[in-house]
Design a protein with these regions (language model features):
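Histidine-centered catalytic/metal-binding microenvironments
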Residues: 1-28, 32, 145-190, 199-200, ...
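Extended carbohydrate-recognition surfaces in non-catalytic/accessory domains of CAZymes
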Residues: 1-72, 273, 684-719
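Aromatic-lined ligand-binding clefts that engage carbohydrates, nucleic acids, or primary amines
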Residues: 73-101, 569-575, 583-584
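Beta-strand-rich ligand-recognition modules
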Residues: 95-146
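Catalytic alpha-helical scaffold of carbohydrate-active enzymes acting on polysaccharides/glycoconjugates
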Residues: 178-191, 211-226, 241-303, 312-323, ...
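Catalytic grooves of carbohydrate-active enzymes
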Residues: 196-202, 207, 356-559, 821-893
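C-terminal (or distal) subdomains of carbohydrate-active enzymes
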Residues: 317-322, 336, 345-346, 361, ...
Length: 1014
C-alpha cells in the first residue's frame, strides 16, 4: 500500500494508518502496516488496512510525527474556522495515547474509541509526537482499526463545507434505502445517554462499584454542561449500594431523578441470566427489583425491564414480568444471532398463558454520535417498524463510562445540520409512551427468545450452577419452614422471626457470573458468599422446622432419655404425590411406630431404609433402635419387617424393581426396560468426549462441529455390582478421559421409578466437551424440557432454519422424548445444556474453556442425573414431579429420645399433594396477614387446587402481593356440588400454563407469622 502524503489530505479527513511506524523483528523501524506478522497470520485484517499484532497480552508500540497539512493551516486564515480531532478505534485490552510524552487518553476493550481535540500549537505549525501503546487481548489478536484526522466547523453554519462529504453520504444512504434524500417528517432520534455496566466480567465485583461511582458522577457532571442530556441506568442492586456507601453522590442522583434528567430503568434485581435460573428465581428477581424500585424511587412508574445483554430469554418470562407489573421488555442481544436474524424490532411477546410484554429491540448499546452510523440504524428501524424515530443510546458500556463530552459535542454539531435527522433528548419512558398507540398492530411472538449464540453457558463452570440450585432450594425451604413454624406457634409467637435473604443469590445470577463467563477472581470471591448464604438459609430453615416438629422453638426431647430409641423425622418440603422412598440412614433398626421398616445394610456405611409413604408437604416420624452397623435380630414378640414396595432384584447382569429394569454389559448400561418390558435404548448409553475449540467466545460457545471431532474414552472392563439387595442395587464403572479419571456410579432403589447415575471425574482436559448420548429405541416425534418460566416443546426433527439453529438449549431439571407409545426422560440436577433428535437425547456434562478463566471446569466434578421411562408419555409419568423428587430429596431431622411406653408421635401434614402439572414456586410469610402461596400450572388443562381443611383462602394477589379483585375470601372458588370438588370446598383455580398467587392463612385462630422482608 502506498503511504498517503500527509500534506495532501483527502477533503476533511486524513487517514493516518499508513503513517504509523513500529519496530520489526530485527529492531528496524518500518511502516506498521508492513509488519510481516499480520500478512502471515491475519490476511483478512491486513486486507482491511488494520494494524495487527499477536494475542496474549502482548504490547505494540506505534509512533508518528504529526504535522498540520499546509492546506489545512490555510483554512484558519484570517481567523480560526475549523478544529481537528484525532479519531481512533482499537481492539486492545489496554490503550494509552501519549502526545509529546504526556498521556492524554486511555481505553480498553470496552472504551474502544476516542476523538481527541488537537491543540492550538499544532495549527501554529509545531508537529506533535504521537505514541500509541496497545496491549492485545488475551483471547484475540490486537488491532488498530482506524486512525484519522477529522475536521469540524467551529460553527454549525460550516462556511467551508468541511462536513460536505458526510452530508453526501447521508443523502446516499437514504437514496439506497428508497426514501427521500432529505430527512422525512417524523424521522429522528430519541437520544438517551446510557452506560451498560456488567456487575462482573473481566474484572471483579469490587471494580464494578468504582465504575458505577465514576459513571454516575460523570453523567451528573455532564448534565451541568449539556442542558439537554438525559441519562438512564438499570440495576436496583447498584442503587442500593450507592445509597449505602456513597450518600453524597446518591443525594445528587436523587435530585437529578426528581428533575427528570436521571432515569432508573430497572426490572429485575440485576440484569440476570434468563434461561439458567428456575421460575422461582426469575420471579424473585422481578419481585425484589420491583419492590426496591418502587420504594427507592416512588415518584416513577416502574413498568419496564431493561435486559440488553442477557443470553436469551425463556418463553415464560412475559408471564413472570407481567405478574410483577412490568409491561415493556427491552433488549438488544438478539442482534447477536449467528444464523437467523430475529424478524422483529417491535412486537408483542406472548406467554402460553396469554400474558404479554411489549418488546423493543433497541439499537446497539455503547454507541457514539457518528451521524452515518446513526442514520444507518434509523433506516433499518424504519424499514422494520414503519416508524421514523429511533431510540439512540450513546455511551461507553460494559465497564461503565456512559456518554462523553466528545460524543455529546458531535451529537450537537449534527443536530444543527439540516441534512441529518433531528434529535431530541428524553427519557426511555417518554419514548415507550410514544410507541404505545401502535401496540394493537404489532406482530405477536409466541416462543422463547433463543439466542443463536453462547450455547455453552449452560455447561461451563458447573460449580456455579451447583451453588445456585442448592442456595435457591435452601431459601425456598427456609421461607416455607417459617410458615410451618407459624402453624404451631399461633399467639405464642414472640415478634418477627428472621427471614432468608435472597439478594446474594440474585446477585450471583448476573448474566456473566452464573453462566461461568468471567475471570477466575470473580468466582474465587463469590465462593465465601455462597457458603455464608447457605449457612444462613440453612440455619433459618432448621429453626423453623424444629419449631414445627416440636411445637416450640426448643427442638427438644419427647420424654426421659432412652438411648436405645431415637425419634427422627422424614420431612418432605415439596407437595409431591404419594411415594415410598428408600434412603440411606445411620446404622440401626428403623421402625414406623412399632413396626420395623424394610432395611438393607449399605456398603458405604449405614442402612438403606424404605420409609413410610409420603405425600404433600409433611413430616413422617421414624424411630431408630441403635444396634451397630447392621440391623439387629427381630425380637420374638416384634412383628417382622414388612416387605419392600417395588423391591429390587438382581439376576446376573440384570436388575429391576417393577417400575424399570436394566442390563449391564461390556458397553456399560446396555438396555433399559419400562414396567411393561418395552426396551428404551437402541444401543448402550454413550459417554462421549469431543474436541471443543476454535470459538471466539471461548467460555460462551460450544464448537458447532464438535460431533465431527470425537476423542477416546476408555473404560476398565465392565460395570461391577457393589450392592445387591431388596432396597438397593448399585454398580460401579471406572475409566479415563485423557488425563482425567472417571467413576460412574449407578443406583436403583426400591420404590423408585428412575435409575440414578452419578459421574465423578477429576477433570484435567482443555478445550474438550463431555456428553451423554441416550440412543432411543423408539423414534421420537417431539421432545420437551423445562425452562425458566415454564417449559418448551420442540419437534424431534427440526423443520425450519430457526429450529435447526437450536441444536443446544438450556434445561433446568428434565428433558423427555415423546413417541407414539411413550418415551424416555432424563432427570437433571441442572441447569444443563441438552439436545435432542428423533433417535437420541443428549446432555452436555463438562467443558474446558480457557478464556476468560484459564482453569474453568477443571478439578473434581460430580454430575448427577437419572433415566426415567415414560410408558404413556412424560405427562402421565409425572416427569416434572419426579424431577422435583430427584433434585430435592427428603430431609432427615433428628428429633430426640423416646418416652418409654407406646409411641404416640404422629405425622405432621401441611399441604396435600398438588395436581399433576401444578408446581409450588414458593410459600412465604406475609407479615401478620398470613402467607403467600405461588403456583404455576405447567399443563394445558385447567386446574383446581385443594389446599385441604387446614387452610383458609383469602384474596388472589398479583406477583407483588397486591390484591387482585375484591377483598378477603372473595377470590376463593367455592364450587357447587356438581363441580369437581364437594360442596363448599375452597379451591385455587389456575388456567392452562398460568402463574398464580394467593393469600392464605391457617384455619382457626389468627395466624402469627414472621414479618415480611423489608
Amino acid at each position: 500500500m502506498t503511504p498517503l502524503d500527509p500534506t495532501r489530505p483527502e477533503g476533511s479527513r486524513l487517514d493516518l494508518q499508513p503513517l504509523w511506524r513500529r519496530d520489526d523483528p530485527d529492531g528496524r523501524s518500518i511502516p506498521a502496516l508492513d509488519h510481516p506478522w499480520g500478512a502471515r497470520h491475519r490476511p483478512d485484517w491486513q486486507a482491511r488496512g488494520l494494524v495487527i499484532w499477536p494475542r496474549g497480552g502482548q504490547w505494540c508500540r506505534l509512533r508518528l510525527t504529526l504535522a498540520c497539512p499546509p492546506d489545512w493551516r490555510a483554512l484558519q486564515q484570517p481567523r480560526p474556522r475549523v478544529q481537528a480531532r484525532l479519531a481512533l478505534r482499537w481492539w486492545a485490552e489496554c490503550m494509552e495515547l501519549r502526545v509529546d510524552g504526556r498521556a492524554v487518553h486511555s481505553g480498553d476493550l470496552f472504551d474502544t474509541g476516542c476523538r481527541w481535540l488537537l491543540p492550538a500549537v499544532w495549527w501554529q505549525g509545531r508537529p506533535l509526537q504521537l505514541e500509541l501503546r496497545l496491549r492485545s487481548p488475551r483471547h484475540d489478536d490486537g488491532a488498530l482499526i482506524h486512525s484519522r484526522l477529522e475536521l469540524e466547523p467551529l460553527t454549525a453554519a460550516d462556511p467551508l463545507g468541511v462536513l460536505d462529504p458526510q452530508r453526501q453520504q447521508l443523502r446516499e444512504l437514504r437514496r439506497r434505502a428508497g426514501v427521500d434524500e432529505s430527512p422525512q417528517a417524523g424521522a429522528g432520534f430519541h437520544v438517551l445517554g446510557h452506560a451498560h455496566l456488567d456487575l462482573a466480567w473481566l474484572w471483579p465485583v469490587a471494580d464494578t462499584w468504582q465504575a458505577a461511582e465514576r459513571t454516575f458522577a460523570s453523567a451528573l457532571g455532564l448534565m451541568e454542561r449539556f442542558a439537554a442530556l438525559h441519562f438512564a441506568h438499570s440495576t436496583p442492586a447498584l442503587y442500593a449500594w450507592l445509597e449505602q456507601h456513597r450518600p453524597a453522590l446518591w443525594s445528587r442522583l436523587r435530585q437529578a431523578v426528581a428533575a427528570g434528567r436521571f432515569e432508573p430503568i430497572n426490572g429485575p434485581w440485576v440484569e440476570c441470566d434468563c434461561v439458567l435460573i428456575s421460575t422461582a428465581s426469575l420471579l424473585r428477581q422481578f419481585q425484589l427489583g420491583q419492590h426496591d424500585s418502587r420504594a427507592r424511587f416512588p415518584g416513577l412508574d416502574h413498568r419496564l425491564a431493561w435486559l440488553p445483554d442477557s443470553f436469551g430469554f425463556g418463553a415464560g418470562l412475559p408471564a413472570v414480568a407481567a405478574a410483577t407489573g412490568v409491561r415493556w421488555f427491552c433488549t438488544h442481544k438478539l442482534f447477536w444471532n449467528a444464523s437467523n436474524p430475529f424478524p422483529h424490532r417491535l412486537f408483542r411477546w406472548r406467554a402460553r398463558c396469554g400474558a404479554e410484554q411489549l418488546a423493543l429491540m433497541t439499537a446497539p448499546i455503547g454507541s457514539d454520535g457518528d451521524p452515518l452510523t446513526m442514520e444507518r440504524h434509523r433506516l433499518e428501524w424504519q424499514r422494520a417498524t414503519g416508524l421514523g424515530e429511533l431510540l439512540w443510546l450513546p455511551g461507553v458500556g460494559d465497564h461503565g463510562g456512559g456518554p462523553t463530552a466528545e460524543m455529546l459535542e458531535q451529537l450537537d454539531l449534527w443536530n444543527r445540520q439540516p441534512e441529518a435527522a433531528p434529535q431530541r433528548h428524553g427519557s426511555l419512558r417518554a419514548y415507550l409512551a410514544g410507541l404505545e398507540p401502535h401496540a394493537a398492530q404489532l406482530p405477536v411472538w409466541r416462543d422463547e427468545l433463543y439466542l443463536e449464540l453462547h450455547r455453552g453457558c449452560a455447561t461451563t463452570r458447573p460449580d456455579q450452577k451447583r451453588h445456585n440450585r442448592s442456595l435457591e432450594r435452601l431459601l425456598r425451604q427456609a421461607e416455607l419452614a417459617g410458615v410451618l413454624a407459624a402453624l404451631v406457634a399461633g399467639p405464642r409467637a414472640r415478634g418477627p422471626q428472621p427471614l432468608p435473604d435472597w439478594r446474594p443469590l440474585l446477585f450471583q445470577q448476573f448474566h456473566d457470573i452464573l453462566p461461568g463467563t468471567a475471570i477466575p477472581e470473580v468466582f474465587e470471591q463469590a465462593e465465601p458468599q455462597w457458603r455464608a448464604s447457605r449457612r444462613a438459609a440453612r440455619r433459618i430453615r432448621d429453626q423453623g422446622l424444629d419449631a414445627w416438629l416440636t411445637g416450640s422453638g426448643a427442638g427438644g426431647r419427647t420424654g426421659p432419655a432412652d438411648s436405645s430409641r431415637q425419634l427422627w423425622w422424614a420431612v418432605q418440603l415439596q407437595p409431591l404425590p404419594v411415594r415410598r422412598p428408600s434412603v440411606r440412614l445411620p446404622a440401626g433398626r428403623w421402625l414406623s411406630g412399632d413396626s420395623p421398616l424394610p432395611s438393607q445394610p449399605a456398603r458405604e456405611g449405614g442402612t438403606w431404609v424404605q420409609l413410610p409413604p409420603t405425600a404433600g408437604v409433611m413430616a413422617a416420624p421414624v424411630w431408630r433402635q441403635s444396634g451397630g452397623a447392621r440391623p439387629g435380630p427381630v425380637a420374638p414378640d416384634e412383628p417382622p419387617p414388612e416387605l419392600p414396595t417395588q423391591a429390587v432384584w438382581v439376576d446376573g447382569r440384570r436388575a429391576g424393581n417393577g417400575a424399570l429394569s436394566l442390563q449391564l454389559g461390556p458397553g456399560g448400561i446396555e438396555q433399559l426396560w419400562d414396567d411393561q418390558g418395552r426396551p428404551q435404548l437402541a444401543a448402550p448409553l454413550a459417554w462421549c468426549r469431543h474436541a471443543d475449540r476454535g470459538e471466539f467466545w471461548d467460555a460462551w460457545d460450544i464448537a458447532a462441529n464438535y460431533r465431527s471431532r470425537p476423542l477416546p474414552w476408555r473404560w476398565q472392563g465392565q460395570p461391577q455390582w457393589r450392592e445387591r439387595g431388596p432396597l438397593c442395587a448399585g454398580f460401579l464403572w471406572r475409566g479415563t478421559c485423557g488425563a482425567s479419571r472417571v467413576r460412574l456410579d449407578g443406583r436403583l432403589l426400591a420404590g423408585s421409578p428412575w435409575l440414578e447415575l452419578v459421574l465423578s471425574i477429576d477433570w484435567r482436559q482443555r478445550h474438550e466437551l463431555l456428553r451423554l448420548e441416550v440412543p432411543l429405541a423408539e423414534r421420537a416425534d417431539r421432545w420437551a424440557a423445562d425452562t425458566s418460566g415454564g417449559m418448551l416443546e420442540r419437534p424431534a426433527e427440526p423443520l425450519t432454519a430457526r429450529e435447526r439453529a437450536r441444536w443446544e438449549v438450556a434445561a433446568i431439571s428434565w428433558m423427555a422424548s415423546c413417541g407414539g407409545s411413550g418415551g424416555l426422560a432424563v432427570l437433571l440436577d441442572g441447569p444443563q445444556g441438552v439436545s435432542a433428535g428423533a433417535d437420541r437425547l443428549g446432555v452436555s456434562l463438562l467443558r474446558a474453556p480457557t478464556w476468560p478463566d484459564p482453569g474453568a471446569d477443571n478439578g473434581w466434578q460430580r454430575q448427577r442425573l437419572a433415566l426415567l421411562p415414560c410408558a404413556n408419555g412424560w405427562r402421565a409419568a409425572g416427569v416434572p414431579e419426579q424431577a422435583l423428587a430427584f433434585r430435592e430429596p427428603l430431609l432427615l431431622r433428628r428429633g430426640g429420645h423416646a418416652t418409654p411406653g407406646p409411641v404416640s408421635t404422629t405425622a405432621r401434614a401441611a399441604l396435600p399433594a398438588l395436581p399433576a402439572g401444578v408446581q409450588l414456586l414458593g410459600l412465604r410469610p406475609l407479615g401478620r396477614q398470613g402467607a403467600v402461596i405461588s403456583l404455576i400450572n405447567s399443563s394445558p388443562c385447567r386446574q383446581a387446587v385443594d389446599l385441604g381443611p387446614g387452610w383458609c383462602i383469602g384474596g388472589r394477589l398479583d406477583g407483588l402481593d397486591q390484591p387482585l379483585g375484591t377483598a378477603w375470601h372473595t377470590d376463593a372458588a367455592i364450587l357447587p356440588p356438581t363441580a369437581s370438588g364437594p360442596a363448599g370446598q375452597a379451591l385455587l383455580r389456575l388456567k392452562p400454563w398460568e402463574l398464580g398467587f394467593w393469600l392464605i392463612r391457617a384455619a382457626g385462630p389468627p395466624l402469627t407469622v414472621p414479618a415480611a422482608e423489608a
